[in-house]
């Protein structure tokens, strides 16, 4: 992608003995798109990336594990991207509940500061990430916990946390100087919150959705989608929505 090509070119310049390699990236694509990804949203992001690449876009994915979110925000501020598909905002939940994937208070702020188009999804806000079961804070020991792997324990966010998270997401987007749309996948915001999944609690998801809707500015369209976040139809709509915003 554009970022890796620039790094390689700068490295080549240094190796050839240049004091300062000021490499300008050629306009080799239709544009550069940043996308946030997680294990529980991989299918969605893979489909989004596939569609965008076919259309000539340069796509960079960032794993929402803390450092990934920080890197994405930093590169957005540096002007590397033309738009953002923020599919996986789970780092907000980790920041709220002291999870291991927190990226700090500045997550979900850079695109708004830069004024670039962004489509935002509350992907994986149903969970907080911890390490081994023994690392879960004592105050959360009686919560709904799920071992995603031997070294990863997920905690289901509750009603109070979802009310807070919805408001936080909305208030951050309200500060945007550019176009914003929010997509709500009504059939689950992760794999494990799909029907029959370990975190399937549609009534809690609804609290999150309602909190977002009542706190966003009137200028931000909230689109409810009768699909799970990992359904192909949801990914197609997410990309189509972003492309329409870029053409405004």
Features from the language model and the residues they span:
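A solvent-exposed, charged loop/short amphipathic helix patch at secondary-structure junctions
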Residues: 136-153
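Metallocofactor- and cofactor-centric catalytic cores in central/energy metabolism, strongly enriched
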Residues: 1-113, 118-120, 130, 143, ...
